[in-house]
Amino acid sequence: MNFRTLLRFTVCGIFAAALLLSSRLDAQHLTLEGQTGGFLTPTAYVVYTDKGHVFSHPAVGYHFVNTSNVIGNVQTVSFVEGFANRAEVGYTRSIHTLGNSAAFSSLWNYNGMNIFSGKVVVLKEGTGGELVPGIAVGGIVRTGDHFVSGALNKELGLGSDTANTNEDLYIAATKTWLKRPLPLLLNFGWKATNASIFGLGGQSTRFGGRAFGGVGIPLPLGHGLAAVPSAGFTQEPPQVKNLGDILVGGKAHIPTTLDYAVRITQKQKPHFSFDLGIGQVAGNIGQTAVATGLPAPYPPVVLVPVDLKARKVLGMGLSYRY
């Protein structure tokens, strides 16, 4: 397996490394979009604030997702501030490079987008009993999202290239159980969103509800470190604005994102984490008709599969809290 293939695993595995570890998994573990959580999915934790303080030390994150074949590689840089272990706000800049497909990569020929996030803990983990999960509500706003929907707006002659704004509003419930016989980290949530594949897939045709979640198993490594093998999922909106206009049947097939990942971090009061994962995102999403330009008896059009070649992607992430 060469380096390019290896690095193609990301988008998701990443997502689910959405699982943390020790009793302080609420510290600096940031998602691709700059929230405390796994690689992609948010948890009910926020950036840790020292006792007696209102403001946390800032947490920073860097993530890389290799989807170079069609979509193009994605990098994000995040800065997040926590407040009294009750809330956090953050800013993430998504940096994008052009993919390698002459046929389809033009739909992602943009520098990236801005991502603003916020989260509030409404119920702290363990309130009223050790089995009670933490519950948080939060939101994301992505601005300057030209991907797919914006690009097709111009290519289809519907208007100018459009920079869309899309949002997520979510609730997440998270429980870390570190007792025998089996330590577990469980995270499940629901979001209302109008973004496809976290904005990378464009704007969905409507605002709708989607589920996400994951499970991890915290394992001690020695020297104060722990590993969290995990698996997770994120449901995607069924359709993308403008995309059906170029597909046979008028509909795309956007599958649920799956991920399998490992997170390495400190067991107590963690200041860093490293994520590495394999994800299954989107592959063949449909067919498009392409004119042959040939005279009869040759067919006037041929059907070409629209393959995003992102069913096996590699991602990595680094997070650090000062």
Regions found by a protein language model. Name each.
Residues 64-68, 93-99, 122, 139-145, ...:
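Transmembrane beta-strands of outer-membrane beta-barrel pores
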Residues 83-85, 119-133, 174-179, 217-221, ...:
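Outer-membrane beta-barrel proteins
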Residues 54-60, 75, 85-87, 114, ...:
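Outer-envelope beta-barrel architecture signal
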Residues 62, 77-81, 116-122, 171-175, ...:
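Residues on the lipid-exposed face of transmembrane beta-strands in outer-membrane beta-barrel proteins
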